[in-house]
Amino acid sequence: MSPMQQRELFSSPPIDLLFFEQQALKQGHRVIAGIDEAGRGALCGPVVAAAVILPTGMAIPGVDDSKKLSPRTREQLFDEIMARALSVGIGIGTPQLIDRINILQATRHAMAEAVDILAPRPDMLLIDGISTIDVPLPQKTITKGDSRSLTIAAASIIAKVSRDRMLTELDLLHPGYGFASHKGYGCASHMEAIRRLGPSPVHRLTFRGVREHVTCPSS
């Protein structure tokens, strides 16, 4: 591991990453789950949500918004979070669900699915973004929560690594699109592959950049 990777992995988290967790504890909550998603803006594959419950007061060094971390560091922290969390839930919104009910509702569905898996049952949810979810639990939405809350940041890492692994598997099932490299986002090589090959069974057919290449069957 290089010195830069060591600093990235083992630097102490800012004190304010526990602010929202401490606030919830002062309000009487005892089991706090952080929730985040990965893949909302991609052109293919599922949107993946994760819900994470950490032991009260635990700070895992290096945990931060997954987008700020290198792939190797995310993988290392994924293993650390999975080993130390009280519970982790993962929910999925498939491309078909996204096309049927839209990406926002599919994301909310995946988040609710992730929460339903958790044991013990949380009594407070900290959710990245501005949308609550359909579960009968107290909830607080936090804009840019993946860089402001430790438990949300942990969930962002679980969601991101889980989805990246799924896209690597989809790359083997649907070769030619480069899913393993761009993870389904709309880079130039991906757009060219869609133009050349047409959408795959795991593309989001209602998304701009994909829908233009959907061909209707002849009647």
Swiss-Prot record:
GO terms for cellular component: cytoplasm; ribonuclease H2 complex. A divalent metal cation binds at residues 36-37, 128. SUPFAM superfamilies: Ribonuclease H-like. Manganese or magnesium. Binds 1 divalent metal ion per monomer in the absence of substrate. May bind a second metal ion after substrate binding. Gene3D superfamilies: Ribonuclease H-like superfamily/Ribonuclease H. CDD domains: RNase_HII_bacteria_HII_like (cd07182). It catalyses: Endonucleolytic cleavage to 5'-phosphomonoester. GO terms for molecular function: manganese ion binding; RNA binding; RNA-DNA hybrid ribonuclease activity. It is found in: Cytoplasm. One of its GO terms (biological process) is DNA replication, removal of RNA primer. Its EC number is 3.1.26.4. Pfam families: RNase_HII. HAMAP family: RNase_HII_B (MF_00052_B). Endonuclease that specifically degrades the RNA of RNA-DNA hybrids. This is Ribonuclease HII. The gene is rnhB.
